[in-house]
């Protein structure tokens, strides 16, 4: 499992993964896990990052280090680029990530409370990242995540970004 070093270290320490299955990765690092033409780059993000584990011996929940928060830029062999933002809040590095990686598809949280709300997500989409397409995520999975795709679209207003309408379990081809 490629992920932030702190998270992979925690998973190894708890015995969930073996060291061979948990290679370390750091922000700014790029890997080519399935060949030279597909690249995954770990980028900075802003959100909490902990790993909740139910100890099988005590049956109690434990909070462990989850590693630094990150997002992922995935560049496919045809050049199509995806930016998975994760549980992100609006932050300044988005002004660098958008122009540097120029994602075709943005997977963007819109639910609010733990992540950006629809208005903040629309600002990040339209003013900072400027993707061709955006796929709203991290909404309606928790009562506190009240933002909706309709609110995101309304906040986005006139934009060249196409918003992907999808429900959990939907599949899309690009």
Q: Where do the PLM segments sit?
A:
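Divalent metal-coordination and catalytic microenvironments
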Residues: 1, 40, 87, 106, ...
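Short internal beta-strands
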Residues: 1-7, 133-138
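Short, polar loop motifs at secondary-structure junctions
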Residues: 4-10, 26-29
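Phosphate- and divalent-cation-binding pockets in alpha/beta enzyme and binding domains
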Residues: 9-13, 93
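Glycine/Thr-rich phosphate-binding loops of Rossmann-like dinucleotide-binding domains
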Residues: 11, 50, 116, 144
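Binuclear metal-ion centers of metallo-dependent hydrolases, dominated by the metallo-beta-lactamase
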Residues: 15-19, 23-34, 120-174
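Core dinuclear metal-dependent hydrolase active-site scaffold
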Residues: 24-99, 168-174
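Metallo-beta-lactamase
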Residues: 64-122, 127-129, 137, 141-143
